[in-house]
Amino acid sequence: TFAPPFAVINDFQLLASLSPRDKRAGYVEAVKVALIRDRAFFETIERDAEALREFEPVAMQRLIFRCAELHLNHIATSGDPFEFGSARPLDFGHWAAHKLEQLSEYRIRHGEAVAIGIALDVIYSQRAGLIPEATSARILSLLEKLGFELFSNELLHVDAQGRLMILTGLEEFREHLGGELTITLLAEVGRGIEAHEMRVPEVVEAIRELHQRALRRSQPSA
């Protein structure tokens, strides 16, 4: 069974045993909770981005502590610690991430998949008129500064009918939530809102935008 623990001990020395890839993978959960809960924390991550990219210990400790604090506050105050309800804001960016992990046969780490999922939902939020383009660009830029790739070829995988397989992640997420689709999108940095539908054409356009962004970044500068 799963239950909220009585306590969690964070031993920062444990980080020394991780590869750079696995250290980085944890950052995205901090970006996620900052985006939906705490604008000031997001701005702190922006200021610390270069230090975090180099795995500077003080910056990492600051990020881990506040990230854990925000997650704990949500679990303690949301009234739904066992997640019986359909609203799960801490799953921001996760509907696509879970499917990407599966499609890649878990070659893509969870954190790497969540970074892509957040990028996808941020662009969708922009296209839905919830946030301006400047905000979207700011978020994507931070994820890239931290060392994340925001596109993987699995986003373009299709089934026998030519349908993008990533889109089945929406239906699987709906089932995971017990029947009603509830997706967290962004209203602004620091505030998430609930949506009960994702318009497929706009999701596809968001995927194309991420693909084009990745192609531009891969081309050598003049």
Residue ranges of model-derived segments:
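Solvent-exposed alpha-helices and their adjacent loops that cap or buttress functional pockets
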Residues: 1-3, 56, 81-83, 175-177
